[in-house]
Each structure stands twice: as structure tokens, then as C-alpha cells.
């Protein structure tokens, strides 16, 4: 996965132009919006999640395999708006998914999240999102904090799976690959 943070005074208008889904639906709180990213002809380039971080600041998480294509698309559109892009090359994303995910999360963070809502502090962003169709969260941080969180979950006996397993779950849930 690829993490992009956006800055500037015209982010909402930028996102209205960039994606077909209505970004104004998530402006009232820290929430997420699933959306396709389209090319100029309306063809799908990728699926991504847009996160409202508060104060009209946004983050997009897209697929890693399309990060360069997406970054170029973001830059092209951003040049028409007062928007700067920060590709977070040191980002860590841990997808904690499955029926016990919230219980496992609560052993580390005492938070409750509704679907497509998020929590953020100085070190992490935790979003009630995921690409598996299962109950779960995605934990985004820098690489050092991500390793700390990863090691904690491994020490608790939580089993990691790879992208192939995640992609199988995506297919079962009817999500695009």
C-alpha cells in the first residue's frame, strides 16, 4: 500500500476533481471514503481510500503496485490547485483483520471505531477500514512504530498472512484486485 498526505488550501476542490465520489460526505469528522481513481476517459486506474484527517487535511492510501502511476496523476491534478503531496515512503501499514481484530486492537489501544471512522494521535492513524471484507482496522505509522506494533501482535500469537491471502479475501468479498 502507498500513503500520500496532502497539504494546501484547496484540498477539497482538488479531491472533488480527482475522484468521482463525494468527498464532502466525510468533512464533518475524521472519516474515510472508498473511491475509484479514474483516468481522463473515465477508466479505472485504481481503487483507494481517502481519509479526512481534520482541518481540511487529507490522506490517500492506494495500492503499492500503482503508486507511481497514482503519484503522477495526483501531481498532474494538484498542479491546478493549491495542493502539495507528500508520499510517505517510510510508512508502515498493518491490516489487523478478522473476527478478533477489535479485541486484539483493544489490548494495545483503548479506542472504539465505527466503520470508516478513524483515530489519530502523534504516532499512529488507526482506521476502521480494510480490503478483506472482514471486521478490522488498518494501522498506519512510520516504519519504527510499525515494527514495534508488529512485534507486539506477533508476541500475542497473532498470525500474519501475506498479500496473496488478502487478495483471496478481496475476491471473496467482491472487491476489485
What role is predicted for each listed range?
Residues 1-177:
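Basic, glycine/lysine-rich polyanion-binding surfaces/domains
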Amino acid at each position: 500500500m502507498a500513503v500520500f498526505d496532502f497539504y494546501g488550501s484547496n484540498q477539497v476542490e482538488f479531491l472533488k476533481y480527482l475522484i468521482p465520489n463525494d468527498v464532502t460526505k466525510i468533512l464533518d469528522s475524521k472519516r474515510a471514503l472508498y473511491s475509484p481513481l479514474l483516468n481522463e476517459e473515465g477508466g479505472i486506474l485504481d481503487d483507494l481510500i481517502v481519509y479526512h484527517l481534520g482541518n481540511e487535511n487529507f490522506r490517500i492510501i492506494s495500492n503499492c503496485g500503482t503508486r507511481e502511476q497514482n503519484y503522477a496523476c495526483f501531481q498532474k491534478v494538484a498542479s491546478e490547485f493549491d495542493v502539495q503531496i507528500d508520499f510517505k515512503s517510510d510508512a508502515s501499514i498493518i491490516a489487523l483483520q478478522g473476527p478478533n481484530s477489535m479485541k486484539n486492537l483493544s489490548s494495545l489501544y483503548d479506542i472504539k471505531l465505527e466503520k470508516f471512522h478513524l483515530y489519530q494521535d502523534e504516532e499512529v492513524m488507526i482506521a476502521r477500514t480494510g480490503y478483506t471484507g472482514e471486521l478490522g482496522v488498518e494501522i498506519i505509522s512510520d516504519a519504527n512504530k510499525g515494527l514495534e506494533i508488529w512485534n507486539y501482535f506477533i508476541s500475542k500469537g497473532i498470525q500474519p498472512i501475506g498479500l496473496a491471502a488478502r487478495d483471496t479475501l478481496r475476491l471473496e468479498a467482491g472487491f476489485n484486485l
